[in-house]
């Protein structure tokens, strides 16, 4: 018990971070990179993540519970609707919603739809994350950032590659 008390200081922070985006936006890959090893399944096949998945990251001054969600998309069947519902519910009662946009694919109507869902979230910080920057030129990554920036109001923005 004493160890826990000394661990939980005023400087210690903790919270829930939900990752959302279109299928194959890099949500599971980002979780694996932050955790430091493969804990989430990754695949080029859309809808590999079918259930919300939580990964706990603990550092000296913080603990973050990252919530991986199914890719959000225009549903064509009941499964698609259920996956979207799961992702939308994962944005409830969290501290941060990270909206991931793939730098290698043009921002489109799917991203616009996901951004609308993120805009509906109240009480959470919203972070725009441009992923897969290693697959495009710096100029393209900046263009993607600008296009995605127009989809909402963001508390923070980051362009990254989870691979390196």
Q: What does each of the following model-derived ranges do?
A:
Residues 2-96, 101:
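Conserved G1/Walker A P-loop phosphate-binding module
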Residues 25-29, 109-110, 136-139:
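P-loop/Walker A NTP-binding module and the surrounding RecA-like catalytic core of P-loop NTPases
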Residues 46-48, 70-73, 103-107, 133-136, ...:
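Conserved nucleotide-binding/hydrolysis micro-motifs of P-loop NTPases
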Residues 81-83, 112-113, 142-145:
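Charged helix-capping and loop-helix junction motifs
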Residues 96, 125-127:
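Structural signature of beta-strand start/N-cap positions in the alpha/beta core
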Residues 108-120:
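Amphipathic helical hotspot of TIR/SEFIR-family domains
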Residues 124-125, 134-164:
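Canonical P-loop GTPase G-domain recognition
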